[in-house]
A protein has these predicted regions:
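Short helix-coil transition sites and intra-membrane helix breaks within transmembrane domains
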Residues: 94-101, 149-154
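Terminal-appendage/accessory-domain detector
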Residues: 1-98, 190, 194-207, 214-455
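Function-dense linear segments that define catalytic or interfacial modules
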Residues: 77-95, 103-118, 125, 132
Length: 455
């Protein structure tokens, strides 16, 4: 039987998507659209400036652009900076217990620029990276977040390496080396959620994917069984050792997980664990016209892993607020919105907002969503007012924007343009000067070269 590491390498070096390729590429294109949008929106965040300053004296060779800076950088460095920007606002898409696009897209954009890859090849590389990530994460029955792992950093490095190895057309042997090297570069801790280090995880993952491939091309060796070995990647990451290291990976390329799991597009720039709660609170608050002064208590029922990510119960900064169920509830009630405008230090500490934090209680349940084990099967919100009225959201499983409750193309375009406006990035399609960035991404499969994307 072919081992997992070898099976992954075989798929990456010679992928086959069958009759479902076009549908898979459409999902990948959504990943590019959403990531480039959030990258543009987040490029002015302090963490991006810190990373840019860190690299200020090491900008050669000039291989790939950082579009929002208008500067050229070494490929891995460009991927690092753009991935940090894409994840800085925590507004980027979600799947596979993490944020696949914010690791995959920056790595593909950077190396694709170096290689003069076409838009079609970029989309195929995304699918390759996604499928490798999906194969690995599907083998664990427990929740990575409860072990302290941030899957975006842990799986992102391997997924990015797979995508870049495909772009580079590495043979099977070199691909295996690259994937195994990337396995030793996997990192990212939940304890750093709500700080600048969380988007740093995405930056490192994208850069590590490129570095692993280039090290392999230079002849660096690595274990031929790194993923399935008892002292290897999957066992080391596993919370209780119940990970399946021996299952054949014979469905790779035959059953495309990108079509089963898809991508969930965030409507709110906060941890996805809070999105069900926000939908529930907004539904009740809007229907009943509830005001903050009327609230006696708000009770949330959610998953154990979700609650572990929402670790800030009394946030005092906009960053901390992104990982706070209490803030999500308060913002939804006070502002009837949980958006970028609310994610500020001043709003998080406003008396009418912070006054609600102590009125929020959280109950965890052990149910698991079979589509994403980081989530409970459903969440629920109940609100009680000072005059004794009680309101119940009912079971909430798929928030709007989820892959199984998707926003439409018009909604995705609105988010894209809003992100560009937030980042103060001019979009030529608005001015009518040319087809514009949005339209170039929307027709990415027809673009002869990625170098034409950010013209």
């Amino acid at each position: 039987m072919t081992g997992l590491t070898q099976a992954l390498a075989a798929f990456v070096s010679k992928p086959s998507f069958g009759d479902n390729e076009q549908a898979a590429l459409a999902v990948a294109k959504t990943g590019f659209m959403d990531t480039i949008a959030t990258m543009m929106a987040g490029h002015n965040e302090p963490v991006v400036n810190i990373v840019r300053q860190f690299f200020a004296n090491t900008t050669t060779p000039a291989e790939a652009p950082v579009p929002f800076l208008g500067t050229m950088h070494p490929s891995a460095q460009a991927a690092f900076i753009t991935a940090v920007a894409g994840h800085a606002l925590d507004y980027d898409d979600v799947a596979l217990s993490g944020h696949p696009s914010t690791a995959l897209v920056p790595a593909i954009l950077a190396e694709g620029y170096v290689l003069n890859s076409s838009g079609l090849e970029a989309l195929r590389a995304y699918v390759v990276g996604y499928e490798v990530w999906a194969e690995l994460v599907s083998r664990e029955t427990d929740q990575y977040h409860l072990k302290g792992w941030h899957p975006t950093g842990v799986f992102g490095a391997v997924g990015a390496a797979a995508a870049v190895a495909y772009l580079r057309r590495l043979n099977e042997a070199d691909t295996r080396q690259a994937l195994a090297i990337s396995a030793s570069l996997a990192s990212g801790l939940v304890a750093n959620f709500g700080t600048m280090t969380k988007p740093f995880h995405a930056g490192r993952a994208a850069a590590h994917g490129i570095e692993a491939v280039r090290l392999s091309m230079l002849g660096m060796t690595s274990a031929a069984d790194v993923f399935e070995h008892p002292a290897g990647y999957l066992n080391a990451l596993s919370k209780a050792g119940r990970v399946d290291r021996t299952r054949p990976a014979d469905t790779l390329g035959k059953t495309l997980r990108i079509l089963e799991t898809g991508l969930s597009i965030k409507r709110y720039p906060v941890c996805y664990s809070a999105h069900r709660t926000i939908d529930g609170v907004l539904k009740i608050a809007d229907t009943e016209n509830l005001q903050a002064a009327e609230i006696k208590n708000v009770h949330i029922t959610t998953g154990v892993a979700q609650a572990s990510m929402l670790r800030n119960h009394h946030p005092v900064t906009g960053l901390e607020a992104k990982f706070s169920a209490e803030f999500a509830v308060a913002s939804a009630i006070v502002a009837r919105e949980v958006g970028l405008a609310q994610l500020t230090d001043s709003f998080a500490t406003r008396s009418d907002v912070s006054g609600l934090y102590s009125k929020v209680s959280i109950e965890t349940v052990d149910t698991v969503c079979p589509l994403d084990p980081a989530f409970a099967l459903t969440d629920r919100v109940t609100i009680e007012t000072n005059d004794g009225r009680k309101f119940d959201s009912g079971a909430i499983r798929f928030p709007l924007g989820n892959a199984l409750n998707p926003i439409d193309a018009a909604g995705l375009k609105r988010k894209f343009l809003d992100c560009l406006e937030t980042g103060k990035v001019a979009n030529s399609s608005i001015k009518g000067a040319d087809v514009g960035l949005y339209d170039r991404i929307a027709t990415l499969e027809t673009l002869p070269s990625l170098r034409q994307l950010f013209k």
